[in-house]
């Protein structure tokens, strides 16, 4: 009998082992769909971004008008731009849900997969930040100025790093040019990291909602999960296209309809919604260096998740106290997101400080203590 090329060809064999004959736990829920949705988001962003880059000019005098030209004069340019801008929001929705699922079901115990995932999040955040600067609107310019200026808080070398990143003494043409270069490069880095992420995942096999070893009960990825993923893709593309067609500017900042002006500061500088929780943590500390460290810690704390796991059970499915804490953490993050969008005045300052403190207390102190308590309860 002739060998099946799907199982013998070097390249097809790799694809087959990752997407077709991959043994998958039979009980993984829709929460496991977000990995494939993130892959779709990445492909959509790279494709729309490539088309936008063909019409974009990375120059301070032309950037704003080149984006306007894309929307007005390029065939379906408005749609490509709207899909790209809102695609970023959906990318972050998916990654936050993906991380939340990993946290809830103890997927972080696959340490290599988890750590590459956190690196992916950091790279995605960097990509979104440099991309936000490119249209060269008011909030683009001032956002870039404020966030890059944070590095000046680093003792001794801070100011040098900032001027080196800017390519001058303020955010100007060299900054825009290098941000465009970085925004073009980083998505391909994300794609490379994704392959590493998948390699580590397929090394250990996927986790499941029960958190138990599922070697005795696995099914092939295709057709079961390939079909389930296609349903997920349809359910993601529906709200994305609806938003791009009906309310493309819903999540954007009105300030970005004004070209960048270094002489006029917007009344309230704030980043895109998906960075607001971290921005609120940054602002809640009156000291500049302290704020920058808290901002970094708000994301880097994810690296500690495997070390802080003290429970005898992997998932939170049967741990009501940990579930309560988890949802308190989700509510806390929503409060931080809201606070980040508000001006720096009473009562928002104190709410932000309380929410920031609670965020770190829940993650670093309450979760391990609760896990230890639940372990004790198991013995009764």
From Swiss-Prot:
Heme b b566 binds at residues 98, 197. The keyword Metal-binding applies. It is found in: Mitochondrion inner membrane. InterPro entries: Cyt_b/b6_C (IPR005798), Cyt_b/b6_C_sf (IPR036150), Cyt_b/b6_N (IPR005797), Cytb/b6-like_sf (IPR027387), Cytochrome_b (IPR030689), Cytochrome_b_C_euk/bac (IPR048260), Cytochrome_b_N_euk/bac (IPR048259), Di-haem_cyt_TM (IPR016174). The chain crosses the membrane at residues 34-54, 78-99, 114-134, 179-199, 227-247, 289-309, 321-341, 348-368. One of its GO terms (cellular component) is mitochondrial inner membrane. It comes from the Eukaryota. A ubiquinone binds at residue 202. Binds 2 heme b groups non-covalently. SUPFAM superfamilies: a domain/subunit of cytochrome bc1 complex (Ubiquinol-cytochrome c reductase), Transmembrane di-heme cytochromes. Heme b b562 binds at residues 84, 183. The cytochrome bc1 complex contains 11 subunits: 3 respiratory subunits (MT-CYB, CYC1 and UQCRFS1), 2 core proteins (UQCRC1 and UQCRC2) and 6 low-molecular weight proteins (UQCRH/QCR6, UQCRB/QCR7, UQCRQ/QCR8, UQCR10/QCR9, UQCR11/QCR10 and a cleavage product of UQCRFS1). This cytochrome bc1 complex then forms a dimer. Component of the ubiquinol-cytochrome c reductase complex (complex III or cytochrome b-c1 complex) that is part of the mitochondrial respiratory chain. The b-c1 complex mediates electron transfer from ubiquinol to cytochrome c. Contributes to the generation of a proton gradient across the mitochondrial membrane that is then used for ATP synthesis. Belongs to the cytochrome b family. This is Cytochrome b. It comes from Oceanodroma microsoma. The lineage of its organism: Eukaryota, Metazoa, Chordata, Craniata, Vertebrata.
